[in-house]
């Protein structure tokens, strides 16, 4: 992690490489079993698109089946899991909620925009980098909470210090 001054404020910053061979912004999560993840700035929930058995083998805990959620161009259903500790670069997500919904993508998971709520992030397609800046008002420890509102799942994100 490096530190930069933005408007006189020192902010933490890190950069992850994007896969140069893919048209969609995809990164490899060295800190999470080396899996690949696509960044989706329109996604509300993180989504596991690979086999659920693999997710369970990595320690994820099944919470509920047949959960309706919006995505992939409409409403669908999936199984809600919690990953005990998920890392993306310098960010840590304890008890990360993730929906498992099999899809034919060339990655194992989709990282949602809500995971980076309150942060400054840039998908630099020219240099193939994902740059994340963490303002002093935010933490590297991110807490995502899924709430059910009238049968629709939505997610809240807060940075919390441990």
Question: What is each stretch, according to the model?
Answer:
Residues 1-162:
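Pepsin/retropepsin-fold aspartyl endopeptidases
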């Amino acid at each position: 992690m490096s530190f930069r001054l933005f408007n006189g404020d020192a902010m933490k910053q890190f950069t992850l490489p994007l896969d140069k061979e893919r048209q969609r912004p995809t990164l490899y999560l060295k800190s999470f079993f080396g899996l690949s993840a696509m960044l989706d700035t329109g996604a509300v929930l993180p989504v596991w698109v690979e086999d659920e058995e693999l997710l369970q083998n990595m320690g994820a805990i099944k919470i509920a089946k047949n959960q309706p959620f919006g995505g992939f161009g409409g409403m669908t259903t999936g199984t809600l899991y919690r990953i005990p500790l998920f890392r993306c670069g310098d960010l840590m997500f304890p008890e990360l909620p993730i929906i498992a919904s099999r899809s034919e993508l060339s990655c194992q998971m989709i990282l949602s925009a809500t995971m980076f709520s309150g942060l400054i992030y840039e998908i630099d397609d020219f240099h193939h980098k994902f740059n994340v800046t963490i303002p002093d008002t935010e933490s590297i420890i991110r807490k995502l909470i899924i709430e059910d509102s009238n049968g629709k799942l939505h997610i809240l994100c807060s940075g919390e210090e441990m």
